[in-house]
Amino acid sequence: DTDRSRGLGDVYKRQVFVDIHDEQAVEAAINEKTRVIFAETIGNPKLDVVDIEKLAETAHKHNLPLVMDNTVATAYLVRPIEKGADIVVNSTSKYINANSDAISGVITDSGAFRWDKEKYPGMAEYAKFGKFAFTAKLRNGLFRNTGACLSPQTAFYNLLGMETLGLRMERACDNAKKLAEFLNTYPDVTVN
């Protein structure tokens, strides 16, 4: 059985885009069909930073998992699960890899979200795996159907990049701070 229902098609049928910083807009967009709240830790391309704790509070109030894309920040700068996110995704091809010589990604499940069988019927058969239910669903459906399996060479490239991740992220932060301080001296440059 490799139909769409085995992947995440049963979860991601329709996307609604809202200003993730506008609490009222987020609340207004949530209805009985909403299944997940997805946001980027640091948005691309605006580089805006989301309040993960506030977003997690909103998601959990409505019994929704909060999925954070942490590609730009990486776990070196921000650990979304510690701030209330349920699932974190990263494109490792960017900062983690360092050289963009391999295409891959990582999904990290906190195991904290309790999948309601009524709201998420596709998760019912995975309830027996407890906190690993979402991971089991990914493995049985998405990974099996799309061939999402990291090759040894790609893993090697990612590990090489991780050796310098800390240094690179510190330098990026230092450079960003210096640039912001420099631009702050120009009255024609404003931050909205």
Which sequence ranges carry the predicted segments?
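Single conserved hydrophobic/aromatic residue that forms the stacking wall/gate
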Residues: 1-12
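Buried hydrophobic positions in well-ordered alpha/beta secondary-structure cores of metabolic enzymes
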Residues: 37-40, 55, 69, 80, ...
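Gly/Ser-rich phosphate-binding catalytic loop and adjacent alpha/beta segment
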Residues: 6, 15-29, 41, 46-49
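Hydrophobic beta-strand scaffold residues
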Residues: 15, 66-67, 88
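Active-site C-terminal subdomain of aminotransferase-like
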Residues: 87-90, 95-192
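Short acidic/histidine-rich motifs immediately flanking catalytic phosphotransfer sites
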Residues: 30-37
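Active-site core of PLP-dependent enzymes with the aminotransferase class I/II
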Residues: 28, 42-65, 73-79
